[in-house]
């Protein structure tokens, strides 16, 4: 946005300019050039050279017209001033993406391109304008600073009148690929490169004669740059959540231009800047020839060497009038969804759906005009890339209003010709933008008439109590689906079935503040309408009085969940049915159609039509048929409508879906509609106006609602709004990464997904168990086993999946999310998933199937036909369900925290950080202070004395759980109501276990499969039933303690209950915005944690550094240390182990709680087996050190045994350390140590999986990452540091002292570490640890004899140390290729590499 209407300073990636807005002239000023350190390797340089010297074509320089003519301005929807509002919703989000992902501002380059010498011709108008009118604002308001695009006269020769257009001089779009980089001016220059640095590429004439392609160099460079950048972003996205243990050390390889590359590039740029202006005259005979102006087939290299400029046709008509006509003739995308909706076809039925298309990346977006039948028409030309093949796509008609950005991913439902060119217009074809973002059909349909409301609804999680309409609607839906399944039998025993449904929804009735009589009255009034529908459309087709043309003959599925990346849609269809349609008495057809039931009072609603027609696309994709019809059932008038989708309607719906996806991807908002009539009745009007106020535009002129709203918002201070802006920006950044990661599941190769622990494939079903519930409700349990095509055994226990995890099941044919559920059991050979939807094969057709007249499938309810379920013919895949991040709910809580009605404790204590107050004394029954130490007693007294909040810093092993349970008991004695929450379910349950047996009642909220068996008595399960509302009210409202996870506070019970105290355990692991939800529900709060251990887990490393990893606990403890009570006495570690964390992290403040704890040592039940151990001169001296109880801490240095790491596909492993840990485990077990007493920790998940695989026979040994081990402990802990390399690279994870602190504080009597002393010393924090270990003589350096003679000839990885060459070169080769053992056979010989001397 421009802050100065007269003059603006712009800085965009290498151009610093001042612009006079009145004239639009760009005047270059001095700027300091810097280079972005991109990697251009030797292959890149060769590409550039081949590109510059391609002699396949010879192009002569066209003559330049000397004739001067007056300029005619092009009509454009956007202007370069602040008042421009067209399509501005993307501007702010685009700016945020730029802030988040652009290179450092210091990396700018001064352009040497002279505005008078820039070669531009009319057929390159599209390259210069770069955008459709709907997205030109991104060039108008580009990056973080405003950009003024220089519009200069460009001459064009023609036999007709010669005229001049204004076009952009400098804009050359970069490919922004999948890392969401924004559009930026890519101006390359040769400044600051001396002649002796650059290689001569010959004169301009020489280059011209060999093929003048130099003007394409910037595009090639940008593609190469972003290909590298995109790959890094993708790797970082998958690595950032620590899957496979990657530490995102993607920049270990130098990522910079070498001097020779710089010289070559600058030489090309210099020649590029010397090219003369050119003019080209083009003509076209008709519209189709105009479309195929470029031959873009082939790969990227051919694109760089052979792509020519686009042709365009211009007639004698004045350009401004032609453009006026073209722009004004475009219809509005919502024109098909006005009040006079036409259910009939518009004369052009949708053709057969194209074959499932590839996903393309948009490399270039050009805007130009075509001439047809005496008129100019606007079109967009896209250059696309898929699998290194370039394609050209032309968008015409309504599609020119589509917002498309360079770097967007799209799917194309159109046929490409042999030249890889296709056209999408109003007659044929579709494009799907960001198909991996699955927009729900309901959300798309709800965007009529307000697109902004649909976006806000998705952006902000609004959780209110259920309403009467919702409850009755759900019951009626169930009854209707039961009728579809049972037919005429459903009309019998209606009263009994009705009462059963009421019991099923009794919780919703309670939370909606309804009585059972109210519900019965409402249902009694509407059930006759439902019966009428059943009798007219479901029962006998040959009824005497049945003249309906629609007969539902069979039910295929209920609540069918369909995900369609093909159309970028998802939806839950009320019913999928087979319908007999009778157009004429003698003619009928059986079709498979979606059926949507609407139980509300409003009929013929436009959003209902839109939702139903979108379901036709989902059905077409799932069942492999071409259908354009849907059934819409209105209970209010007992009718079923057969809707027929026309091309124009589907086109409008897909374009609306694309707009929603683009706003979702760029985190932007559409403009307000400013319609008082609509806004008065909008449920999200407050959120809408709040977002408007947060934008730079304010709400002053939004609409007539603002006066009262502004009065209300006067209570909100600027610091409150700044608080919201800060955290909302961080949430957006985190959400953006999660959005990309969700899409990865739908597109990535299964091998890569399996490597990151996200997917299991290929699987087949071994068993199906069905549990019948009330009415027709059923639960299904499926057991899956791996289908081992290659004969390689695979183990589910090491797959990265765990019990309780939410998953969805798909098949190998691209039918996504056939069922959702959670894992209930895992064994090495099978995995069991519980789901409420039966797995079936939707595409399985009956023998008499016909695509047009008899679309009959087996369906989900043909039990006799489901014998194929257990066969191996269908391969399934299980994916982790990461599509529900909860960020929308967190954003809604964040917003409510700054509004005027937010609790004062939030606004004063958290936002404004006022100091907490404490009363002078607090009375506590001494009974609750028994068995507590001095620190714990002080903590309890401070919590009781707090008027606002109190903090408890619990160091490792200091008894935080015991302190919390004692605090709760003391508060219960004072009749206080308590909300107990934590970051994990396990922490909540550990506290509740200690509270079992107390007099007060407890209610535990959460999914039963995530709750510890010992506390399931406190929660609702499927077997829990209530006969009346009074007993349900007693269950929810009487208990003094309500317990849930930190994200479980969006339960409906919290609309009814408030608390005296909120106690949050693990508060140092919870991001600040998440803490706001629980704290809004209580008058006071107590936070318990340790910010010296693991901070909040944030997926996006950039967001973490920007502050999202800051916990409320850390913020308050540093701002107001007087509120903190520290627990210093620990009861876990002996003195030696305690000294590690105490001296490194806590400044000596962590001390043993008793002498017994301090002196505790390892007990070996079979210690006599150690009597014959060799002395210190023996090669097995390391085993003696290992098991010696007096050595509580020991570090085994692997530098001298070639224990190097291996890194494949960004997966880090160290087989040497894994080998040593196996031997250590065997040594302990041989001497009687229990498996359950041993724990193994690694920083990297890939190493954890390697160890788990190699130790799979020891099922009671817990092997996990540091993150999973927080809050747990073992007698013996073995730590694998993994990193060992010649470059001494340790990665980011080993620079994190929080993580190191957790690893070192898990052991009780024995802490054993394996690692490379030389490599780990390069980490500052680990080097301090090593110095401490060296000081205490706790380091033992292993040598080759320690492992070489341990095994006999048949099992030795390296039989004899003489096999290992001692020269430096040989060692390097071994270190690079060493693999000690095969994961399936610990004693298998390694194949030694060929040594070179």
UniProtKB/Swiss-Prot annotation:
Listed GO biological process terms: double-strand break repair via homologous recombination; Okazaki fragment processing involved in mitotic DNA replication; removal of RNA primer involved in mitotic DNA replication; replication fork processing; replication fork reversal; response to intra-S DNA damage checkpoint signaling; telomere maintenance
Positions where Phosphoserine occurs in the chain: 134, 219
UniProt KW keywords: 4Fe-4S, ATP-binding, Chromosome, Cytoplasm, DNA damage, DNA repair, DNA replication, DNA-binding, Endonuclease, Helicase, Hydrolase, Iron, Iron-sulfur, Metal-binding, Multifunctional enzyme, Nuclease, Nucleotide-binding, Nucleus, Phosphoprotein, Telomere
Cross-referenced Gene3D superfamilies: 2.40.30.270, 3.90.320.10, P-loop containing nucleotide triphosphate hydrolases
Source organism superkingdom: Eukaryota
GO molecular-function terms, A-Z: 4 iron, 4 sulfur cluster binding; 5' overhang single-stranded DNA endodeoxyribonuclease activity; 5'-flap endonuclease activity; ATP binding; ATP hydrolysis activity; chromatin binding; DNA binding; metal ion binding
Matching Pfam families: AAA_11, AAA_12, Dna2
Residue numbers binding ATP: 954-961
Needed cofactors: [4Fe-4S] cluster
Post-translational modification: Phosphorylated at Ser-219 by cds1/check2, leading to association with stalled replication forks.
Region spans: Helicase activity: 809-1397
GO terms for cellular component: chromosome, telomeric repeat region; cytoplasm; cytosol; mitochondrial nucleoid; nuclear replication fork; nucleoplasm; nucleus; replication fork
Keyword Phosphoprotein belongs to the record: yes
Cofactor, free-text remark: Binds 1 [4Fe-4S] cluster.
Chief place where the protein resides: cytoplasm
InterPro entries cross-referenced by the UniProt entry: Dna2/JHS1_DEXXQ-box, DNA2/NAM7-like, DNA2/NAM7-like_C, DNA2/NAM7_AAA_11, DNA_replication_fac_Dna2_N, P-loop_NTPase, PDDEXK-like_dom_sf, SF1_C_Upf1
Family of this protein: Belongs to the DNA2/NAM7 helicase family.
Quaternary structure and partners: Interacts with cdc1, cdc24 and rad2.
Protein name in UniProt: DNA replication ATP-dependent helicase/nuclease dna2
Biological source species: Schizosaccharomyces pombe (strain 972 / ATCC 24843)
Gene name of this polypeptide: dna2
